[in-house]
Amino acid sequence: MLNNRACKVGAFLMALFFVITYLLPLNGRLLWQPDETRYAEISREMLQRGDWIVPYLLDIRYFEKPVAGYWINNISQWIFGDNNFAVRFGSVFCIFISAILLYRLAMMMWHNRHIAFATSLIYISMFLVFAIGTYSVLDPMFSLWVTAAMMCSFWGLKTDCTRRRIMAYLVLGLCCGMGFMTKGFLALAVPVIVMLPIVIYQKRVLQIVCFGPLAIISAIAISLPWVIAIALREPDYWHYFFWVEHIKRFSSDDAQHIAPFWYYIPILILGVIPWLGLLPGAVMKSWKERKSNPEMFFLLCWFVVPLLFFSIAKGKLPTYILPCMAPLAMMMAKFGVDCVKNGKMELLKINGMVNVFLGLLAVIVLFAMEVVTKHALYQPSEWLKWVLAIVAFGIWGIIGYLCFALNGKYWLLAAFCSIVVSLVIGHALPENTVNSKLPQNFIKLHHQELAGSRYILSESVGLATSVAWEMKRSDIYMFERWGELEYGLNYPDSRYRYISYKDFPQWLAKARKEGRVSVLFHLYKDEKLPDLPKADQISRNYRFAILVYEKQP
């Protein structure tokens, strides 16, 4: 067990790691479209309208998600303003709270500060957690509520005090209710399918029958006011959200983001870096101790069952398995601390060598792509970015070697492998990536034209939300492609916000009498601009393009 001085040093180092990797780079990195610009704009419009009940995007009804995740982003923008830091801070905050909850859960399970500290550090330094936790999506919020729900579930199973058990199930319901208002019915399904094998194996079914209704009551109590409010405001919301967003997305043949069953295996392998060397041992240890150690069986079910559930679903995205990383971090922490305790340092040294290999592999690939192959990531003028990337991954390998050379004694140093990568990634992205996925610079370059435009049209929803966020205006028209706004654009009061190629010439002739018209495109690499009326100004930067039509009498 750690002494007080070691605890203070460990807490300081973890806080330093969190500040350097999670907070410092936030504002300096451009926003990615379509996700980050979408959530930035939704919250900006919510704050502008003062309506926290019905989500809108570009002043068009947007029913893909409930509102609790937006509320967190709203508060962030309300405190920090309209900037990239505020857009991402909600995600960072949720990862931070999740790490604290995992520390507390580890203490509940093992009463060992070393394991608890290692759990939190491993969690926040996992590549998947870091990548999603510094990216503005709703998954960190959803993962927070799932983590809190599972902590309450364990608390309810462990305590012998009836009063505390009642409290645990009531808080469990509150967490599920907030998770439901963040990402829908998944927040209710995940804790249930995880706890089912646990209570059956531990013969606690009667406890769930007796106390489970308390969780249901508290979940309904916290979510019902908003459920009723949005049903009164938008009667069609629940039809769309249940049938389209849940049933169609996860089970139908035309579900979004269809991927094979094994899709999450490579995602998981990459996601646990820089702790990949601990993955096999941690899972095997949990499986071997499933009978003798109820805590390990609890974590194993929490990790495996949602992973299988999301693998069976037809629609898949890397962000979906973020809730699986919390139990995996705890399993790895227990495995690592037990290795030190039992003198099995060679198992920890393996993780160091894995990071040496990963750092060296990244350096070789970067060097080969620029020097040997014809598939260069960077342009010749971007040599400094190339050097930055090589240095970052070189330091990754060096830290991995230190973990190995020091005989695994300082195995937790592996967390710092990615620290330089996190600091430089925003400055080391190739220009072709910036000019295809991060439109803020392109929009700022054409700020004058856009600011003086009476109408702005966009062929891409991601580009439309980027313009809306940068220009602080939500009256962007969709051009030819409906995208994710199709459902909202079909409402009678929003149909005028869609212009097709066929109708554009006639619409343009009328619109130019009112003022300048700007049309934005997000093209494929070699795609040509469509055949449209001749513009007064055309500008293209790799995949982004703008056509400007000046006002005519």
Swiss-Prot record:
Pathway: Lipopolysaccharide metabolism; 4-amino-4-deoxy-beta-L-arabinose-lipid A biosynthesis. Its EC number is 2.4.2.43. The keyword RNA-binding does not apply. It catalyses: 4-amino-4-deoxy-alpha-L-arabinopyranosyl di-trans,octa-cis-undecaprenyl phosphate + lipid IVA = lipid IIA + di-trans,octa-cis-undecaprenyl phosphate. It holds the Pfam family PMT. It is found in: Cell inner membrane. One of its GO terms (cellular component) is plasma membrane. This is Undecaprenyl phosphate-alpha-4-amino-4-deoxy-L-arabinose arabinosyl transferase. The lineage of its organism: Bacteria, Pseudomonadati, Pseudomonadota, Gammaproteobacteria, Enterobacterales.
